[in-house]
Amino acid sequence: MRFLLGTNTVIGLLGGNAGVLAGVRRYVPQDFGIPAIAAHELFYGAYRSARRAQNLALLDGLPLAVLEFDKEDARQAGEIRAALAAAGMPIGPYDVLIAGQARARGLVLVTHNVGEFARVSGLQVEDWQS
């Protein structure tokens, strides 16, 4: 695994965003994972949508691994949160968990939310959305 796909990147993938599709096509499905936190956000959105059944089916059909959040992910997220709070530059609670998981596992986070994640030291971030 090389890449962790953020929530907005998965939405872009499902929605046919040309940049995301081009990025994904350069690799194999085993190169990608979805953070459990992002999966939660995606399922929440699906359950709140007018097209609930269709969106749930899309999510259930994704051939990508969902990465469970473990102790080292939590440790990294805690360190990131403390550092950003001390610097007066906090990021959202879900984003800090996703950042912790990506950094703990040495994965590149693919997200359109670069401004938020760029504050995290040692985190590799790419934006594939067009």
Indicate where each model-derived feature is located.
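A general structural signal for well-ordered alpha-helical segments in protein cores
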Residues: 35, 39, 52, 56-59, ...
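Alpha-helix capping/helix-boundary segments
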Residues: 9-10, 38, 73, 98, ...
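Acidic, PIN/NYN-like endoribonuclease modules and their adjacent C-terminal/linker elements
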Residues: 1, 99, 103-130
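Short, well-structured N-terminal submotif of metal-dependent ribonuclease cores
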Residues: 1-34, 44-61
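Residue-level recognition of specific faces of alpha-helices
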Residues: 23, 58, 65, 76, ...
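Active-site neighborhoods of divalent-metal-dependent phosphate/nucleic-acid chemistry enzymes
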Residues: 65-112
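Generic structural signal for small/hydrophobic residues in well-ordered secondary structure
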Residues: 6-7, 20, 42, 77, ...
